[in-house]
Amino acid sequence: MRKLGIDFGLSRIGFAISDESNSFSLALENFDYDGSYEKIIQKIQLFLDEYKIDKFIIGYPLNSRGEKTKTCLLIDEFIIHLEKNFDQKIKLINESYSSRKASEILHQANIKNKKQKDKKDMLAAKIILQDYLDLYK
């Protein structure tokens, strides 16, 4: 069974999927978030229809003191919606620096700042998911 990585942002959500052996992660896509959990649930259902997913791996951006950020509170609300709609397990991973890592990778690949915006969130989801896969091998 595969894992779905989720980088939940205030305006965009990045998605990544594991391979069938759960060895590596692949960036899937970004989803523009307008505050509608219903649209996110519909999008995730499309992933579930296409892939056999048993767990959602969600980035949880704690601050440098290990405390919840404002985004964590939104993610907590998002998790309530996931639990109401799906049976998959949910695992939170501290992802305080995944977006920064994603930006660095895109910069090193000589991708211009304007195009980085289109790729950063799904790359952050890929990093979150890969960190999880590496941790639980």
Curated annotation (Swiss-Prot):
Subcellular location, record wording: Cytoplasm
Principal location: cytoplasm
InterPro entries the UniProt entry points to: RNaseH-like_sf, YqgF, YqgF/RNaseH-like_dom, YqgF/RNaseH-like_dom_sf
Disulfide-bond pairs as recorded: none
GO-annotated cellular components: cytosol
Coiled coil: none
Record-level Gene Ontology MF annotations: nuclease activity
EC number: 3.1.-.-
Keywords, in A-Z order: Cytoplasm, Hydrolase, Nuclease, Ribosome biogenesis
GO biological process terms on file: rRNA 5'-end processing
HAMAP family named in the record: Nuclease_YqgF (MF_00651)
UniProt function note: Could be a nuclease involved in processing of the 5'-end of pre-16S rRNA.
Entries under NCBIfam families matching the protein: RNAse_H_YqgF (TIGR00250)
Protein name: Putative pre-16S rRNA nuclease
Organism: Mycoplasmopsis synoviae (strain 53)
Lineage start: Bacteria, Bacillati, Mycoplasmatota, Mycoplasmoidales, Metamycoplasmataceae
